[in-house]
A protein has these predicted regions:
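Acyl-donor (CoA/ACP) binding surface of acyl/acetyltransferases
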Residues: 1-15, 19-25, 57-149
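Secondary-structure transition/capping residues
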Residues: 28, 37, 50-54, 111
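Charged, low-complexity, helix/coiled-coil-prone segments
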Residues: 38-45, 66-72
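Sparse recognition of residues in long alpha-helices and their boundaries
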Residues: 33-34, 54-55, 142
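Juxtamembrane/interface motifs at transmembrane-helix termini
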Residues: 36-40, 48-50, 84-86
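Conserved GNAT-fold acetyl-CoA-binding loop/helix
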Residues: 25-44
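A short helix-loop-beta-strand connector motif used in the catalytic cores of GNAT acetyltransferases and
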Residues: 44-56, 65
């Protein structure tokens, strides 16, 4: 596989982001699909925020989606991913999880993944990467990577 880049989102990513966030399959467990205005608002409030809550991920200059990477609590970073359907089942989410865990560890933090119970792929990746299920918060299942994993 080629190298994945994690980078700051840019205003010019709005159209590619819209194609992803307007897809019903992508948004199935998140929210109703976004229209252009909602996509632009999300980009402003989450991607262009300081510090960002999400970052773009690309391969060969093509935006594949975004990763979630922001403070969850004083000791942890929340991480996750939202990817174009053509990236599903190809190991992208697993590779991105490894990269984000590495970033969190370099910052002296551990990592947390939250998902709805129906997100079996997310749960599978969390478990495969040695995240421990720690309970539910606001209807979301919470997985935490033990320190030094």
């Amino acid at each position: 596989m080629k190298d994945l880049t994690i980078r700051r989102l840019r205003p010019s990513d709005a159209e590619a982001l819209y194609r992803i966030l307007s897809d019903r399959q992508v948004m199935r467990y998140l929210e109703p699909p976004y229209d252009r205005l909602q996509t632009e608002q999300f980009l402003r409030e989450a991607g262009l925020a300081e510090p960002p809550l999400v970052y773009g991920t690309e391969e060969d200059g093509r935006l594949l989606g975004y990763v979630i990477y922001h403070a969850y609590d004083p000791d942890s970073m929340e991480l996750g991913w939202v990817l174009s359907p053509d990236c599903w089942g190809k190991g992208y989410a697993s590779r991105l999880t490894d990269r984000l865990v590495e970033l969190a560890h370099r910052a002296g933090k551990t990592a947390v993944i939250e998902c709805v119970p129906e997100q079996t792929v997310t749960r599978h990746i969390a478990e495969k990467k040695c995240f421990a299920y720690v309970g539910r918060t606001d209807g979301l299942e919470v997985y935490r990577l033990p320190p030094n994993e």
